[in-house]
C-alpha cells in the first residue's frame, strides 16, 4: 500500500497548478518568466493575485491529500511523511512538465498540515512574518522550513528524518536564491 500511495503522491505532485493556470489564462509560463519558478510567488508577479491564490491552494492540497490518504490507509506517521515527500518530489520534478517544477514550499506546507498541524502553523507563521519584514519570499521559505525541526523532534520524532530530508530538498532548490541573497541581488516584493 505504501508504494502505491507514494506513486500516486508523486503523480499528484507532478500536477503543476502554476503551469496549468498560466496556460489556461494565457499568462506567461512561470518556468521561463519572472523568477523562473513554477510556484505561487512567481504567479503573483506574472498573473496576479487570483491565479497566485489558486496556485497556492492547489499546491497546498497536493501536499495535504496524499498524507491524509496514507493516514486513512493505516500507514504510520513515518510512512505518511515519506508519502508526502513523494508529492513534494512530484512538485520539484513533475513528470508531466519535463521534470522542471517549483521549489516545493507550498506543497511541503500542505504535507505538514496533514502530518502535524502545529508544525505547519509554525512554518506558515514564520514565513508570513519573514516575508512581511523582508518582502523576500525565498528568505521566508529558508527561515520557515527548518524551524519545524525542533518542534517535530519533540512532538513527532518519527517524522524527524523525513522532514529533515524535506528541509534539505527545499534549501537545495533555493540554492540560486541563497547566492542572490548573499550577493544582494535577490528579488523583493
Swiss-Prot record:
Bilayer disposition of the protein: Multi-pass membrane protein
Domain of life per record: Bacteria
SMART domains per the UniProt record, alphabetical: G3P_acyltransf
Disulfide bonds: none
Predominant location: membrane
Keyword Transmembrane helix: yes
Pathway: Lipid metabolism; phospholipid metabolism
GO biological process terms, semicolon-separated: phospholipid biosynthetic process
Molecular function (Gene Ontology), one example: acyl-phosphate glycerol-3-phosphate acyltransferase activity
Subcellular location: Cell inner membrane
Ranges that cross the membrane: 1-21, 50-70, 77-97, 111-131, 151-171
EC number per UniProt: 2.3.1.275
Record's function text: Catalyzes the transfer of an acyl group from acyl-phosphate (acyl-PO(4)) to glycerol-3-phosphate (G3P) to form lysophosphatidic acid (LPA). This enzyme utilizes acyl-phosphate as fatty acyl donor, but not acyl-CoA or acyl-ACP.
Any one GO cellular component localisation term in the record: plasma membrane
HAMAP family according to UniProt: PlsY (MF_01043)
Keywords, ordered alphabetically: Cell inner membrane, Cell membrane, Lipid biosynthesis, Lipid metabolism, Membrane, Phospholipid biosynthesis, Phospholipid metabolism, Transferase, Transmembrane, Transmembrane helix
PANTHER family: GLYCEROL-3-PHOSPHATE ACYLTRANSFERASE-RELATED, INNER MEMBRANE PROTEIN YGIH
Assembly behavior: Probably interacts with PlsX.
Reactions the enzyme catalyzes: an acyl phosphate + sn-glycerol 3-phosphate = a 1-acyl-sn-glycero-3-phosphate + phosphate
Similarity remark: Belongs to the PlsY family.
Protein name according to UniProt: Glycerol-3-phosphate acyltransferase
Amino acid at each position: 500500500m505504501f508504494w502505491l500511495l507514494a506513486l500516486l503522491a508523486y503523480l499528484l505532485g507532478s500536477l503543476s497548478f502554476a503551469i496549468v493556470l498560466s496556460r489556461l489564462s494565457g499568462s506567461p509560463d512561470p518556468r521561463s518568466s519572472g523568477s523562473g519558478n513554477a510556484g505561487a510567488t512567481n504567479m503573483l508577479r506574472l498573473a496576479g493575485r487570483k491565479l497566485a491564490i489558486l496556485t497556492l491552494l492547489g499546491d497546498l492540497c497536493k501536499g495535504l491529500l496524499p498524507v491524509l490518504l496514507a493516514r486513512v490507509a493505516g500507514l504510520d506517521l513515518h510512512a505518511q511523511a515519506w508519502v508526502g515527500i513523494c508529492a513534494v518530489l512530484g512538485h520539484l520534478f513533475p513528470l508531466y512538465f519535463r521534470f522542471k517544477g517549483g521549489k516545493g514550499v507550498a506543497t511541503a506546507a500542505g504535507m505538514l498540515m496533514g502530518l502535524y498541524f502545529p508544525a505547519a502553523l509554525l512554518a506558515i507563521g514564520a514565513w508570513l512574518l519573514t516575508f512581511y519584514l523582508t518582502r523576500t519570499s525565498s528568505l521566508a521559505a529558508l527561515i520557515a522550513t527548518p524551524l519545524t525541526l525542533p518542534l517535530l523532534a519533540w512532538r513527532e520524532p518519527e517524522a524527524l528524518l523525513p522532514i529533515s530530508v524535506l528541509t534539505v530538498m527545499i534549501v537545495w532548490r533555493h540554492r540560486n536564491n541563497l547566492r542572490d541573497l548573499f550577493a544582494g541581488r535577490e528579488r523583493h516584493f
